């Protein structure tokens, strides 16, 4: 039997690889949302925060 792990089991801890990049990613999300006319506010939680 082959000894392997599938992709879902390899990185199941959901740790941020580059925690300092989170602010830049959030800024990018706001910029893209504004280009599409979407207003992001405190009620729009990310999927990471919601689990």
From Swiss-Prot:
Which UniProt keywords are given for this protein, alphabetically ordered?
Answer: DNA-binding
A Pfam family recorded for this sequence: SASP
Question: Which Gene3D superfamilies does this entry report, sorted A to Z?
Answer: Small, acid-soluble spore protein, alpha/beta type-like
One GO MF annotation is: double-stranded DNA binding
Q: Which GO terms describe its biological process?
A: DNA topological change
Q: Which InterPro entries match?
A: SASP_alpha/beta-type, SASP_alpha/beta-type_CS, SASP_DNA-binding, SASP_sf_alpha/beta
**Record's protein name:** Protein SspM
Write down the species.
Answer: Mycolicibacterium phlei (Mycobacterium phlei)
